[in-house]
């Protein structure tokens, strides 16, 4: 009765241990489901990347559409240039036809102008003489009238001022008036002499006109010779424009054909992109469905397997492992040979020119076909883990990890990426800037062996030139939290097994038919995992086709750039020829403009001088008349002031007598007191002071007015003398300039006509130059846009390559994580079965001691 107690204790402890192991298994299953969810999240991220790539393609299409619009703009500019060339040709023919007519017309106009100028000069001289005589007669009569009126006024003043004390001032004024009359007589006499001098100058002006006619004939002959020399240059320019027109037409035809081809290629690429989108969606759905079915099959197998069936599975696995080991050895040899060949080919591929891009694409397709064979064996490992022993060397494990990184089944093989990296080795290094966040949490679950030291990880390089960063190496090498938890549970299991072991009361068994059905399901699941997806292969083919089209598009862009350079060279030649012609025309126009400007300046100066003289003469006359009127007014004001003073004196005398009589008539009462008398005296004294100050002020004011009037009269006399002198000088200058002005008028008219013709030709040439400059600027802008579009396309291409490499590494990591979890679950099931079948506690301890693991790669092969 005492024995059941101790025996039941180990039984309970073993049952607890088994329950703990079952809990651990359930936790592993939950971790596996969590990793599946994370893998689905990665799939969603990949889908987002795919949509981003689709948006990039749309942007590229927009860039291509903009280039097409620019090409249409260039075509319109070409048509405008052709129209301008035709206009230039028509202008040249019209100028040749109308040149002689213009010369004849100029000669005829010149003769008519000379005759009209001679007639005008004669008429103006006659009119000027007649007007001058009339003016002299009028001035004589005016001065006679003025003299008579002055004499009358002087007599009147003498009569008025005979009573006063200012007789001396009146005599002085009379003397001054007589002097003024004498000065006016002296002015009239020289003007008669000047009329005779003007007649002499008129004859001299006629002689000058004849000399100018001879000089005009010489200038016209020189102009005709210059026109003949310009005609040859114009013919050469027209010939050059014809050749340029033919070349530009050919270029336009070529550009039109190439644009049609580019549009066709763009439409094909759009269709292929849509097809690729649908195929990728289908492939994604199929992959998820296969993963779901695989997990369901694995769960069913875990439920029904027994220890005997597990042993049979182990035997089958050993056979499969031997076959896999043989295949791996063969593949390693093949990879070594391929690496040696690639090392030999690297300098050759780096020296390839851009014309060999199509050959590189064909090599990519061959390498794709050669590397697809390694996909099936690695995909089959999802269900049956690889059976490499623990004793394989570090080098073998490194090569195995490298081979696993090279395998792919969805985004293209590593060979295509390698060829791309060799062709574009200057861009592939940007992939090394990826950080750990780009790979997600699945990177930490990769089953890289601890035997991979830092040097081996640092030397690990993807075939496409993809380098892992230090952070990524640490993330791959480090243990995930799930792995740490698993290791801790296993260590706790081994340390806690100290009690005796009693085999469980019973375990689950299956029949032979069920076992055969399970074997068939396992075989079918392995075939499903090993079978390659048709959607993925179609996707790879479409991706290769897109790459070929991309290379063709680059070739077309290069051809278009070459044609654009040729067009720019031709445009530069045309601009040089045009610049030379413009320089010649500009030089001739500058010479003629200098001559015209000099003559115009002379004519303007003469006209301005004539106008100034006429204005000065008229102003002098007006000033003299105004001064005479002012003198008359001042004299009248003085006489009025004398009359007013006389009246004031009379009125003051009358007012004084009136006030005296009024004061006498008033009853004046003397004050009685001394104070009142004193106040009255003070008041009268103040009144007397005020009256005296007022009288002094009036006296000073009258004296000041008299002095001011005297000074004003003297100033007016001086101003009158100065005006007479200036008028005399201006009359002489006017006589000198009249002859020169009449001769310059005809010359000015002729120069204006020539200036108008030259300005019209200059405007036409400047318009042509502006149109050609606009064409050049538009072509330069088109070239800049094409180069920018090319750079953006290349940048997008390399970004897509980097994305593909990153997604490939994520896919490889997720596949390895799934394999490791399957391996771990199978190992735990085997260990549980072995514990159930163990006969003693020593056997259980030995089994648990074998399960002290720190890494997933240390699990024994089942």
From Swiss-Prot:
Keyword Acetylation: yes
Function as written in the Swiss-Prot or TrEMBL entry: Rab effector protein acting as linker between gamma-adaptin, RAB4A and RAB5A. Involved in endocytic membrane fusion and membrane trafficking of recycling endosomes. Involved in KCNH1 channels trafficking to and from the cell membrane. Stimulates RABGEF1 mediated nucleotide exchange on RAB5A. Mediates the traffic of PKD1:PKD2 complex from the endoplasmic reticulum through the Golgi to the cilium.
Subcellular location: Cytoplasm; Early endosome; Recycling endosome; Cytoplasmic vesicle
Organism: Homo sapiens (Human)
Substitution effect: residue 441 to K/F/G/V: Abolishes the interaction with AP1G1, AP1G2, GGA1, GGA2 and GGA3
Entry-linked InterPro entries: Rabaptin, Rabaptin_coiled-coil, Rabaptin_Rab5-bd_dom
Name the record gives this protein: Rab GTPase-binding effector protein 1
Effect on the protein upon substituting residue 818 to W: Strongly decreases RAB5A binding affinity
Coiled coil: 11-345, 534-816
Gene3D superfamilies membership: 1.20.5.340, Single helix bin (1.20.5.730)
Gene Ontology BP terms: apoptotic process; endocytosis; Golgi to plasma membrane transport; membrane fusion; protein localization to ciliary membrane; protein transport; regulation of postsynaptic neurotransmitter receptor internalization; vesicle-mediated transport
Similarity remark: Belongs to the rabaptin family.
PANTHER family: RAB GTPASE-BINDING EFFECTOR PROTEIN, RAB GTPASE-BINDING EFFECTOR PROTEIN 1
Signal peptide per UniProt: none
Impact noted for substituting residue 440 to A/E/V/S: Abolishes the interaction with AP1G1, AP1G2, GGA1, GGA2 and GGA3
Region feature (Interaction with AP1G1, AP1G2, GGA1, GGA2 and GGA3): 435-447
Pfam families: Rab5-bind (PF09311), Rabaptin (PF03528)
GO molecular function, one term: growth factor activity
Post-translational modification N-acetylalanine, affected residues: 2
Record PTM N6-acetyllysine, positions in chain: 282
Annotated phenotype, changing residue 822 to D: Strongly decreases RAB5A binding affinity
Any one GO CC term of the record: intracellular membrane-bounded organelle
């Amino acid at each position: 009765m005492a024995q059941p107690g101790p025996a039941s204790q180990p039984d309970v402890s073993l049952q607890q241990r088994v329950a703990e192991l079952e809990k651990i298994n359930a936790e592993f299953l939950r971790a596996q489901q969590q990793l599946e969810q994370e893998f689905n999240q990665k799939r969603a991220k990949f889908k987002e990347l795919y949509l981003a790539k689709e948006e990039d393609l749309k942007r590229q299409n927009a860039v291509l559409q903009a280039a097409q619009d620019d090409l249409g703009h260039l075509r319109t500019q070409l048509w405008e240039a052709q129209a301008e060339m035709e206009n230039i040709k028509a202008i040249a023919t019209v100028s040749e036809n109308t040149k002689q007519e213009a010369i004849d017309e100029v000669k005829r106009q010149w003769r008519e102008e000379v005759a009209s100028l001679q007639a005008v000069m004669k008429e103006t001289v006659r009119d000027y003489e007649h007007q001058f005589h009339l003016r002299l007669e009028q001035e004589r009569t005016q001065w006679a009238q003025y003299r008579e009126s002055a004499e009358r006024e002087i007599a009147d003043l003498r009569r008025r001022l005979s009573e006063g004390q200012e007789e001396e001032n009146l005599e002085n004024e009379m003397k001054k008036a007589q002097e003024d009359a004498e000065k006016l007589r002296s002015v009239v006499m020289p003007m008669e002499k000047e009329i005779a001098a003007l007649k002499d100058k008129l004859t001299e002006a006629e002689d000058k006109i004849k000399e100018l006619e001879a000089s005009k004939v010489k200038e016209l002959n020189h102009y005709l010779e210059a026109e003949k020399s310009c005609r040859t240059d114009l013919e050469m320019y027209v010939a050059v424009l014809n050749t340029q027109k033919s070349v530009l037409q050919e270029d336009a035809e070529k550009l039109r054909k190439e644009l049609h081809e580019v549009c066709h290629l763009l439409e094909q690429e759009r269709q292929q992109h849509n097809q690729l989108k649908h195929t990728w969606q289908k492939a994604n759905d199929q992959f998820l469905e296969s993963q779901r079915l695989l997990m369901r099959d694995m769960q069913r197998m875990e439920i029904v397997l027994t220890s005997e069936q597990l042993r049979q599975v182990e035997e089958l696995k050993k056979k499969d492992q031997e076959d896999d080991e043989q295949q791996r050895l063969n593949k390693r040899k093949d990879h070594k040979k391929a690496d040696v060949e690639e090392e030999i080919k690297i300098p050759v591929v780096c020296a390839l020119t851009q014309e060999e891009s199509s050959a590189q694409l064909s090599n990519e397709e061959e390498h794709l076909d050669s590397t697809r064979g390694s996909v099936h064996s690695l995909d089959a490992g999802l269900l049956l883990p690889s059976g490499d022993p623990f004793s394989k060397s570090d080098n073998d494990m490194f090569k195995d990890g490298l081979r696993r990184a090279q395998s792919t089944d969805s985004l293209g093989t590593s060979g295509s990426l390698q060829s791309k990296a060799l062709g574009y080795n200057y861009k592939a290094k940007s992939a090394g800037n990826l950080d750990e966040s780009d790979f997600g949490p699945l990177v930490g679950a990769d089953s890289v062996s601890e035997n991979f030291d830092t040097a081996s990880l640092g030397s690990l390089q993807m075939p496409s030139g993809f380098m892992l960063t230090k952070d990524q190496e640490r993330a791959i090498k480090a243990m995930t939290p799930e792995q740490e938890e698993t290791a801790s549970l296993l260590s706790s299991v081994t340390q806690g097994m100290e009690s005796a072991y009693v085999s469980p009361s019973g375990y689950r068994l299956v029949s032979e038919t069920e076992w055969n059905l399970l074997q068939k399901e396992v075989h079918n699941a392995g075939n499903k995992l090993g079978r390659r997806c048709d959607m993925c292969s179609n996707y790879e083919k479409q991706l290769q086709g897109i790459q070929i089209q991309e290379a063709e598009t680059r070739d077309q862009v290069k051809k278009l750039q070459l044609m654009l350079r040729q067009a720019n060279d031709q445009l530069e030649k045309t601009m040089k020829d045009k610049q030379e012609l413009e320089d010649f025309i500009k030089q001739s126009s500058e010479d003629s403009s200098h001559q015209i400007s000099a003559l115009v300046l002379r004519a303007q100066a003469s006209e301005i001088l004539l106008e100034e003289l006429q204005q000065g003469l008229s102003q002098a006359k007006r000033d003299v008349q105004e001064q005479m009127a002012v003198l008359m007014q001042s004299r009248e004001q003085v006489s009025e002031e004398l009359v007013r003073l006389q009246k004031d004196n009379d009125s003051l005398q009358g007012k004084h007598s009136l006030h005296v009589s009024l004061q006498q008539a008033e009853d004046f009462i003397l004050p009685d007191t001394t104070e009142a008398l004193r106040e009255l005296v003070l008041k009268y004294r103040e009144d007397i002071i005020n009256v005296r100050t007022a009288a002094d002020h009036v006296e000073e004011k009258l004296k000041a007015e008299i002095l001011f009037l005297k000074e004003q009269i003297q100033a007016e006399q001086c101003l009158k003398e100065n005006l007479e002198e200036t008028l005399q000088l201006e009359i002489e200058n006017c006589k000198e300039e009249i002859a020169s002005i009449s001769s310059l008028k005809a010359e000015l008219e002729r120069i204006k006509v020539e200036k108008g013709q030259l300005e019209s030709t200059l405007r036409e040439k400047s318009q042509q130059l502006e149109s050609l400059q606009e064409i050049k600027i538009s072509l330069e802008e088109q070239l800049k846009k094409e180069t920018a579009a090319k750079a953006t396309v290349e940048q997008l291409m390399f970004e897509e390559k980097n994305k593909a490499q990153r997604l490939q590494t994520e896919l490889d990591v997720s596949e390895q994580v799934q394999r490791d979890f399957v391996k771990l679950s199978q190992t735990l099931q085997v260990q549980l079965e072995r514990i159930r079948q163990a006969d003693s506690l020593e056997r259980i301890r030995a089994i648990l001691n074998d399960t002290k693991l720190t890494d997933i790669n240390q699990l024994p092969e089942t």
